[in-house]
């Protein structure tokens, strides 16, 4: 089983968690990383998932295979590069970075490290895509 860590539990992080947790026998959220001041910490007793407040400690956990980043774009470069350096595969919500140069650096580093890097940009329910699917 591929064990993932979800970083960020704001509106989009909660949607990702709800959409993916427990839906596959091949992957699971083993850890959720929250800010120490997160109101979501009050929900911790309800979860079967480990909750931590330190990104670095999660990256040091050898049982975590990949990181799902649902964090503000301003931190993406640092968070993605740290995950790659720790040997974790990365799914990051758009945008990958704040500048083209940062994005190119991230892609080069992940490629050299042979780490899977994916950027989320899902529009399958947008009206134009729904119409295209209907016509195909």
Give the positions of each predicted feature.
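A contiguous active-site-proximal alpha/beta segment in oxidoreductase catalytic domains
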Residues: 97-136
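A general structural signal for well-ordered alpha-helical segments in protein cores
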Residues: 13, 40, 76, 80, ...
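Beta-loop-alpha module in the N-terminal Rossmann-like domain of NAD(P)-dependent dehydrogenases
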Residues: 49-109
């Amino acid at each position: 089983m591929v064990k993932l860590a979800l970083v960020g539990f704001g509106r989009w992080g909660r949607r990702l968690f709800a959409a993916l947790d427990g839906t596959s026998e091949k992957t699971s959220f083993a850890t959720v990383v929250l800010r120490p001041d997160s109101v979501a910490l009050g929900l911790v007793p309800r979860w079967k998932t480990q909750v931590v407040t330190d990104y670095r400690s999660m990256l040091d956990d050898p049982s975590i295979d990949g990181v799902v980043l649902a964090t503000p774009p301003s931190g993406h470069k640092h968070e993605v590069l740290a995950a790659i350096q720790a040997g974790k595969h990365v799914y990051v919500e758009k945008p990958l970075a704040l500048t083209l140069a940062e994005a190119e650096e991230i892609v080069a580093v992940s490629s050299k490290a042979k780490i899977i890097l994916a950027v989320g940009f899902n529009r399958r329910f947008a009206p134009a895509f729904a119409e295209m699917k209907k016509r195909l």
